[in-house]
Amino acid sequence: MTASGDPAATLTLKGGPTVGRLGLGAMRIAGPGVWGPPSDEQEAIALLRRAVDKGVNFIDTADSYGPGVSETLIARALYPYPAGLVIASKGGFTRPGPGSWAVDCRPEHLRRVCGESLKRLRLERIELYQLHTVDYRVPIEESIGALVDLQREGKIGRIGVSNVSAA
């Protein structure tokens, strides 16, 4: 990935598309506590459309936002997607209930939730798919290995990680 210090600049994903340095994080378009639908779905849809109309070409979401609500709203608002729009999603958190987050980065879980994200987003391939967190019960090589398999199958373009540090 390359970038400059200019906030209007772009980032180029390795070997892939160029996106605006400022994107839209879609976590908060779900309901309170990132659970369930928003109180005003039409407002959330209008926000997504306005962002794209204003030049945003990168939207970041996750299967756990809602759960599933954020991805569903993105598709309802923007499908068929405009040329150049990059949608990133994540897998590795589950939502047992409102206000509750649990980690699950087992390969079989990641494969399942990526498939569900593809369906909700109405995509054949997610351009950037990220491991949402590290699951200390699962060797990271197994979690990343599952994403590599999904990439080889053409279901994801690029692999990323979220909620990690250099330590």
Show where each model-derived region lies:
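A short alpha-helix capping/helix-coil boundary motif
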Residues: 25-28, 94, 125-127
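N-terminal binding-site loop/beta-alpha segment at the start of enzyme catalytic domains
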Residues: 1-86
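Hydrophobic positions in alpha-helices of CheY-like receiver
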Residues: 78, 91, 147-150
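Short beta->alpha linker loops
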Residues: 65, 69, 91, 135, ...
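A short, structured active-site edge motif that brings together acidic residues
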Residues: 84-97
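A short acidic, helix-capping loop that chelates divalent metal ions and anchors anionic groups
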Residues: 30-34, 94-101
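Glycine/proline-rich, positively charged
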Residues: 97-167
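Conserved beta-strand positions
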Residues: 24, 61, 89, 128-131, ...
